[in-house]
């Protein structure tokens, strides 16, 4: 992920190994990370069991919010790909009990279709 993408607030891919190391304390027994994305300090992680949104807060980033979303709670999602003048892709997730969708932006280098495919399979129960 480049500096320009970081300034714009767009997530880029990160390795499952790095994400596993960073999230070792919150992953369940035998829970495996399948895809991970990083945005400056925040992260978006898809495991074999759930979607995890990590929000590091404050100047030092010591305060961290972990939002765990079971795949069965996702009722719908949309994917918006990059265009000629729109350099970022967007994913919107509608979660049961939430009035508005969770919107996530990704840089143009990120293969948003990998995430879309994994989400579609998980929501379908595969």
Describe the residue ranges of each PLM region.
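Anionic N-terminal interaction surfaces
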Residues: 1-44, 107-109, 126
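Charged, low-complexity, helix/coiled-coil-prone segments
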Residues: 10-23, 53-67, 121-124
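Phosphoinositide-binding peripheral membrane targeting modules
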Residues: 26-43, 47-101
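Canonical phosphoinositide-binding patch of PH/PH-like domains
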Residues: 95-114
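Terminal and domain-flanking low-complexity segments
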Residues: 109-126
């Amino acid at each position: 992920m480049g500096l320009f993408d970081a300034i714009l607030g767009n997530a880029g891919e990160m390795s499952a190994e790095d994400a596993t190391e960073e999230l070792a304390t919150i992953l369940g027994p035998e829970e495996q990370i399948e895809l991970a994305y990083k945005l400056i300090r925040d992260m978006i992680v898809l495991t074999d069991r759930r979607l995890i949104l990590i929000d590091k807060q404050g100047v030092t980033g010591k305060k961290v919010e972990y939002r765990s979303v079971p795949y069965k709670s996702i009722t719908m999602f949309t994917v918006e790909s990059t265009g000629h003048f729109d350099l970022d892709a967007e994913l919107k997730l509608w979660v049961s009990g939430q009035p508005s969708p969770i919107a996530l932006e990704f840089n143009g280098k990120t293969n948003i279709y990998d995430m879309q495919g994994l989400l579609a399979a998980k929501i379908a129960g595969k």
